[in-house]
Curated annotation (Swiss-Prot):
Enzyme type, top EC level: oxidoreductase
Compartment annotation: Membrane
Membrane topology qualifier: Single-pass membrane protein
Organism encoding this protein: Dictyostelium discoideum (Social amoeba)
Pfam families: p450
Name of the protein described by the UniProt record: Probable cytochrome P450 554A1
Origin superkingdom: Eukaryota
One Gene Ontology term of the molecular function aspect: iron ion binding
Gene3D superfamilies xrefs: Cytochrome P450
């Protein structure tokens, strides 16, 4: 017993000294909430980090230090400081933390977790390849899949035959359950088209065991990457618990298997000697670009291509699908704005809305941005790591080398310096061109590569949905606006009642 007490007090002493030395290593060291040994500030952050961290951030004027176990973090929400770090001093703050690399693959593959010169070369490779497939055909495909999903709803939704007519035209309501699966299915379908040039119907996808397994794998993987799973890595004395990450990587192996099958099939089809070959998707384009630049493919490059495809599949599916969930929730809870958007779309005098119409839908665009501002999908972004020590903010704040950095997107969104009445939902807020844009897609060279296709999906799907249907909750009461935190933030899953417009 005496030995156990000695070890316990030794651990307390170790952490106390570690915290004190780090917090006092420079006269400009950051302030933050008082940590307790072993836990650091975990008990103050609580399980709702996306809600508590913005409150702490406001108290410390947009930048503070935080201890997660034995790991030192800097959290920043002040826009000027974010720009200074992520744009003006990008080279010092461009890398991801090691933990995130551990869970997404090694640092030589993909785009989400790689660092340094490898990230530079992969970013250049992806931009060359991505531009070749991001064209009008993709926007046409998004519209096609949106209309296909509407038809699927009408054929497979639950029709309320016994209730009275829901409108003066005698249209019956259609109940749509499992909305999350269908919204994610739409985005996953678009990703499969862009990455692998595959086009499958929603009927086939809804009945497909493989498709449901892909959907489940992505959600499980992202749920496993939330801050409280990562904390195991922060508590250095509990490193054996990191075996849990093996299970996370196992979940990713199913996606790796799919990428391998697609690559092996595609490499047999490509004629590298033909000048007439045209890339039909991202996979084609990646293969051809590397082959042209490097005069052939080696094993490491092949693994890199597959990892890039997996990164696009995961990131492009969950974030866009969750954004659609939030926007529809706010449309249901604010029917007066739903009607205003419909009138805006109706003035276009078109039976279907395309990406080219975005410039003529300012209120819808503002509604989307305001929802994104109040409910950012990645409220704490993905962690970065400083390479060298640096003093920022007009020589006010000292950032040590090898420090983990969190960009507090939610804190930025709730800052009165950026937005008037930031806690209020004002869908016309962004009609004023002087209002600051959101940070939902990041900032600087390492922002979201897929921003354009994501916003096109959101606009095309929502505009045509509103043009063709009125949306309600099943009981005509407001939908709950509870937040479920993983790597992204989603609302509580809900069902929808749709009524066809005439």
């Amino acid at each position: 017993m005496d030995l156990l007490l000695f070890i316990f007090f030794l651990i307390l002493f170790y952490y106390s000294v570690k915290y004190y030395k780090a917090d006092n290593q420079n006269s400009l060291s950051l302030s933050g909430p008082t940590p307790v040994p072993i836990l650091g500030n975990i008990h103050q952050v609580g399980k709702d980090a996306h809600l508590t961290i913005p409150i702490i951030s406001k108290k410390y004027h947009g930048i503070f230090r935080m201890w997660l176990g034995g790991t030192y973090y800097v959290v920043v929400s002040d826009y000027k400081l974010i720009r200074e770090m992520y744009i003006e001093n990008f080279e010092n703050f461009k890398n991801r933390i090691a933990t995130f690399k551990t869970m997404t693959g090694d640092d030589s593959r993909g785009i989400i977790g790689c660092n340094g010169d490898i990230w530079d070369s992969n970013k250049e490779l992806i931009m060359k390849s991505y531009k070749k497939v991001l064209n009008k055909d993709m926007n046409d495909f998004i519209l096609l899949k949106s209309k296909e999903l509407f038809n699927f709803f009408e054929k497979n939704g639950i029709k309320n035959e016994e209730e009275e007519d829901d409108d003066d035209d005698g249209n019956k309501s259609i109940i749509i359950n499992n909305t999350r699966f269908y919204f994610q299915s739409l985005t996953l379908t678009v990703m499969f088209k862009m990455i692998f040039n595959e086009n499958k119907s929603f009927q086939l996808y809804s009945d497909s065991t493989e498709f449901k397994l892909i959907f489940k794998t992505i959600l499980n993987l992202l749920n496993s990457l939330n801050v409280y799973n990562v904390i195991y890595d922060f508590l250095g004395i509990f490193q054996p618990i990191l075996l849990k990450f093996t299970k996370i990587l196992d979940k990713n192996s199913f996606l790796s298997k799919i990428a391998t099958e697609k690559f092996n099939s595609r490499i047999k089809e490509i004629d590298f000697t033909s000048d007439d070959f045209k890339a039909n998707d991202l996979l084609d384009s990646l293969i051809m670009t590397i082959n042209e630049d490097e005069n052939g493919l080696n094993e490491k490059q092949i693994e890199n291509i597959k990892s890039i495809c997996i990164d696009f599949l995961m990131a492009g599916t969950d974030t866009t699908g969750s954004t659609i969930e939030w926007i529809i929730l706010k449309l249901v809870n604010n029917p007066e704005f739903q009607e205003l958007i419909f009138q805006e779309l109706k003035k276009l005098n078109k039976s279907e809305i395309t990406a080219n119409d975005k410039i003529n839908t300012p209120f819808l665009n503002s509604f989307i941005k305001e929802t994104n501002r109040l409910y950012p999908i990645a409220p704490l972004s993905l962690p970065r790591k400083s390479i060298n020590e640096m003093i920022i903010g007009d020589n006010k704040y000292y950032i040590p080398a090898n420090t983990n950095i969190l960009m507090d997107v939610k804190g930025f969104s709730l800052d009165e310096n950026n937005y008037k009445d930031p806690n209020e939902f004002k869908p016309d807020r962004f009609l004023n061109s002087k209002v600051s844009d959101t940070l939902n897609f990041g900032i600087g060279p390492r922002n979201c590569i897929g921003q354009t296709i994501a916003m096109n999906q959101i606009h095309i799907f929502l505009s045509n949905l509103i043009l063709n249907y009125r949306m309600f909750s099943i009981d005509c009461l407001p939908l709950p606006e509870n937040l479920i935190l993983s790597v992204s933030v989603r609302p509580t899953e809900y069902s929808l009642k749709l009524i066809k417009r005439v």
